[in-house]
Amino acid sequence: MNTGIIDLFDNHVDSIPTILPHQLATLDYLVRTIIDENRSVLLFHIMGSGKTIIALLFALVASRFKKVYILVPNINILKIFNYNMGVAMNLFNDEFIAENIFIHSTTSFYSLNYNDNVINYNGLSRYNNSIFIVDEAHNIFGNNTGELMTVIKNKNKIPFLLLSGSPITNTPNTLGHIIDLMSEETIDFGEIISRGKKVIQTLLNERGVNVLKDLLKGRISYYEMPDKDLPTIRYHGRKFLDTRVVYCHMSKLQERDYMITRRQLCYHEMFDKNMYNVSMAVLGQLNLMNNLDTLFQEQDKELYPNLKINNGVLYGEELVTLNISSKFKYFINRIQTLNGKHFIYFSNSTYGGLVIKYIMLSNGYSEYNGSQGTNPHMINGKPKTFAIVTSKMKSSLEDLLDVYNSPENDDGSQLMFLFSSNIMSESYTLKEVRHIWFMTIPDTFSQYNQILGRSIRKFSYADISEPVNVYLLAAVYSDFNDEVTSLNDYTQDELINVLPFDIKKLLYLKFKTKETNRIYSILQEMSETYSLPPHPSIVKVLLGELVRQFFYNNSRIKYNDSKLLKMVTSVIKNKEDARNYIDDIVNGHFFVSNKVFDKSLLYKYENDIITVPFRLSYEPFVWGVNFRKEYNVVSSP
């Protein structure tokens, strides 16, 4: 990171369309390392720090020299990248070749390069002399995309820009794959990773640390956004190691079926979906629960004396008394007195959405654009609503988030409760969330932070004085009240094995956190800083940001203003060239955001430079384009 660029900014205004100083400083590093030196880089910037914009700005610079391929995990994130590409282009202030930038989801990229599940090696020559940018790089390994990336690296000898806020997920294996992809050497995983009997005992050994430092020296960019401008987090529940957890004591009904599942069906309970399910809610016989297609065809099937299912619809008093779910019993009782929007995480792949829907409806909460709840709770004369996001509804997620994040919904009056599975763990931003709930304990520390990071991030809150409440719910036995104060108390298997599933998962999470933090610390130490004049390829981009910052505070100045000239000559040393640049931005009516006039253009008026406000106006319905037909029909009124 080029700290010399950061030093050019004083009291940077972040509330307008802008490129942050650390983003420009990182862009300088990427251009020098990837384009000039043809070396790969791991952009390890903690969530919420704006690494997407950095990557897209870099793609615009690189497009002048090479083709750039950007891979993203899924179609929804592809839409986010396409939108952000428009933002990046508007802020770029320099030439680029858009035709040289290709953005693919991993699925479409797989289809492009495989024939009948076999890599089309003849087609890989198209990637010669190109650059690859991989979003959420920690997720591409262990599947065909990871294999394809390795083949392209070995065949085409091209550099990669890998984006990640989480380089280690369940084990250090992921980090090993990243090292392998970024370096010119083949990694022997057996030499760098120590393995115990359990996953939590898989560690990067000292040899691995040395390999990491040797092979990735000069290839790491680490950045963590300062905590300023963020609301405080208020964790609820009882103290549990270094956090707080809400103990939700199971009823006799839930505990009975929970124990049947644990003792008889789960030989590897830490990874068994049934334990995820019964820890959130029990629904009777597991053989039925694991065959939902069959269950949904049942007519008035009794699951419990006070709970039945009919054609996929749950009904009965149990949805209100909630003996089937200690977590939802706590949740429903608690939300009645809370104000603001809620984000609720769950990862129950089999019947999570089914349970959530009918518990919410039965307790007076209405489905967004769906069924109305029984005796509905109201806000501003409208029903309080909920929505459930799963991988099956990807096509409508963007529209749903537009509603959830809209200023009109800051109080939750349009959509109050957003339930989501793992699909929301990455690349999405939620605004004005005041309550974050974990119905399922995340698998890793990285995933936990990703979920929090959807909401608690810069620019997500207008009022940061009000705290964000976090509830980490754990289903526990009716008589369980253990104080968990130290990991050292749970080093023996016999002590861990008797714990409730959620408590074991929390301990697993904390064991892994120690290893994750160790690797984060190593990466932070390896991230290099330097102070140099800006790279020639980003001079205009940097100047554009300096100009935006200058004219935010200045509505009218003399054409020969010494402060403006001093600012420009801090980048362009030649005064004549600096004056020519000022002529160009004024005559080209450079776009700025001014604190008095808001959106404005620069104009010369007599001997002054002035900011002239503008707005776009148009006649409604001048053109209508029907994209639903096989051909476009253009009509005018």
From Swiss-Prot:
Keywords: Activator, ATP-binding, DNA-binding, Helicase, Hydrolase, Late protein, Nucleotide-binding, Transcription, Transcription regulation, Virion. One of its GO terms (molecular function) is helicase activity. InterPro entries: DNA/RNA_helicase_DEAH_CS (IPR002464), Helicase/UvrB_N (IPR006935), Helicase_ATP-bd (IPR014001), Helicase_C-like (IPR001650), P-loop_NTPase (IPR027417). A motif (DEXH box) lies at residues 135-138. GO terms for cellular component: virion component. Pfam families: Helicase_C, ResIII. Its EC number is 3.6.4.-. It is an enzyme of class 3 (hydrolase). Residues 327-507 form the Helicase C-terminal domain. ATP binds at residues 45-52. Residues 32-185 form the Helicase ATP-binding domain. Its main location: virion. CDD domains: SF2_C (cd18785). The keyword Hydrolase applies. It is found in: Virion. Acts with RNA polymerase to initiate transcription from early gene promoters. Is recruited by the RPO-associated protein of 94 kDa RAP94/OPG109 to form the early transcription complex, which also contains the core RNA polymerase. ETF heterodimer binds to early gene promoters. Heterodimer of a 70 kDa and a 82 kDa subunit. Part of the early transcription complex composed of ETF, RAP94/OPG109, and the DNA-directed RNA polymerase. Belongs to the helicase family. VETF subfamily. This is Early transcription factor 70 kDa subunit. It comes from Vaccinia virus (strain Western Reserve) (VACV). The lineage of its organism: Viruses, Varidnaviria, Bamfordvirae, Nucleocytoviricota, Pokkesviricetes.
